[in-house]
Amino acid sequence: MAPAWSFLLALLLLSCNAICSLGCHLPHTHSLPNRRVLTLLRQLRRVSPSSCLQDRNDFAFPQEALGGSQLQKAQAISVLHEVTQHTFQLFSTEGSATTWDESLLDKLHAALDQQLTDLQACLRQEEGLRGAPLLKEGSSLAVRKYFHRLTLYLQEKRHSPCAWEVVRAEVMRAFSSSTNLQEKFRRKD
């Protein structure tokens, strides 16, 4: 009987250790892949931004959703997930497939998919700790509206190379802001 209890206790301790080691450390798990996405987005550039100056547009980037002073780490994870998910969807459209280098686009999809997987694990963990959804509806809505404006702009411009260049630069801006947000939490930790 004693060996059975010893075995169960050892198994319980090992399970606890494995579960506890799955902690979500946003700045550490997300920053490097985020930089990878930025690098890939930079490499996608096909058109000189200066040749697309007439196509520039103010998409009203929701800076407050990514940089508000009241944003907590758990909410930041939700915002980052939302930005990553919409970026994945945007660069998975038929129009993007005809615009960008297929190999780079595949790498971008893989990097974004990995980020989504990591962020979803963090979301589940944080929601489990708090017992409630993390994202304030206002932040989620602001991010969704921002990406909707990008999509409408692409449709309006008929997915022209310059329109995609403008959108690529905008998405890089969103990812740069999320990197800054991560750095803010890294300094706090």
Swiss-Prot record:
Residues that span the membrane, as ranges: none
Signal peptide bounds: 1-23
GO cellular component: extracellular space
Places the protein is found: Secreted
Disulfide bridge partners, by residue number: C24-C122, C52-C162
Keywords per UniProt: Antiviral defense, Cytokine, Disulfide bond, Secreted, Signal
GO MF annotation list: cytokine activity; type I interferon receptor binding
Main location: secreted
Single GO BP term: humoral immune response
CDD domains in the cross-refs: IFab (cd00095)
Function comment: Produced by macrophages, IFN-alpha have antiviral activities. Interferon stimulates the production of two enzymes: a protein kinase and an oligoadenylate synthetase.
Family, as annotated: Belongs to the alpha/beta interferon family.
Protein name from the UniProt record: Interferon alpha-B
Biological classification of the source: Eukaryota, Metazoa, Chordata, Craniata, Vertebrata
